[in-house]
UniProtKB/Swiss-Prot annotation:
PANTHER family the record matches: PROTEIN PHOSPHATASE 2 (FORMERLY 2A), REGULATORY SUBUNIT A, BETA ISOFORM-RELATED, SERINE/THREONINE-PROTEIN PHOSPHATASE PP2A 65 KDA REGULATORY SUBUNIT
Protein name, per record: Protein phosphatase PP2A regulatory subunit A
Entry GO terms, CC: cytosol; nucleus; protein phosphatase type 2A complex
Pfam families per the UniProt record, alphabetical: HEAT, PPP2R1A-like_HEAT
Organism, as annotated: Pisum sativum (Garden pea)
Amino acid sequence: VEAAHLKTDIMSVFDDLTQDDQDSFRFLAVEGCAALGKLLEPQDCLAHILPVIVNFSQDKSWRVRYMVANQLYELCEAVGPDSTKTELVPAYVRLLRDNVAEVRIAAAGKVSKFSRILSPELAIQHILPCVKELSTDSSQHVRSALASVIMGMAPVLGKDATIEQLLPIFLSLLKDEFPDVRLNIISKLDQVNQVIGIDLLSQSLLPAIVELAEDRHWRVRLAIIEYIPLLASQLGVGFFDDKLGALIMQWLKDKEYSIRNAAANNVKRLAAEEFGPEWAMQHIIPQVLDMINDPHYLYRMTILHAISLLAPVLGSEITSTNLLPLVVNASKDRVPNIKFNVAKVLQSLIPIVDESVVESTIRPCLVELSEDPDVDVRFFASQALQSSDQVKMSS
């Protein structure tokens, strides 16, 4: 677009749209602000675009204000840092305190992005007070939007301001009555770890994490489980065993399948990536030995799943000596579901243990299961025997 044409024709149309009585046109004009701002010279942008943005941030239609809140970061890029500080910070603060929840939701979702283009001092002076207000907003969706991005403010504010001012807000949001708020904070905890350090993390956030491990909403418990390996790598094995080790076994007995499954995968990750096979032998296997005899068959199934995941990590010798006897013993279980899962686990162990162990222990157990009264048990046992034959032939 030629500059002369842009200034005369397009800007004329744009000016008409910004003053239109229908809010749908003004709504669309907001997007035009960001696009035009990138095309115009800086002085023209300040003269034509900035006043429009400021006016739109106070528009009588909440839909227009919502659009400004949604596009604000792009609008800041268009008008440059100096104008952002003098003109758009007050506009953004108004949007964060808007009387319509939808506008506050859009504005809250931008706090970290907006703070990144400010100095820490400006962010602390102008944005942080609004963040404190939003953390107790009457709308759960506003709090949820804030929780999904607030962690990103930690690197902007630095360690001291994060500890003194952001951390109390994190902790209050971690205890929010609305599960999505708690969930959004948990999923971004790693961003604050890097700023405040592990010592403070263990003092301040760990009690909240332990509490959330028993949260009534399974998705919150699941989010905590998924955060555990990262936490483990930062806490170290001693601290982890002391503070969080008990949670691992607790999750293996959760009433939700998704939690039990994630917990089993967690055990594998901790053994494979964080603490090693010796840790698993000392801290996990003894408790697995106890749980394989749990009265509830679903928990016994979870342990079988955990064994199948741990075996490749622990290797042939430990699997043959410590895990395989548990699996063979479980083949005598009264529940068909346990027995056909035993057949599946035995099949997964065939490539891990020595061939002599397959012949002396695994095959006899599978042969017995292949004659079980239950059709599913027979099917999976036969499949495992075929797999054993194929491994034998290929070797």
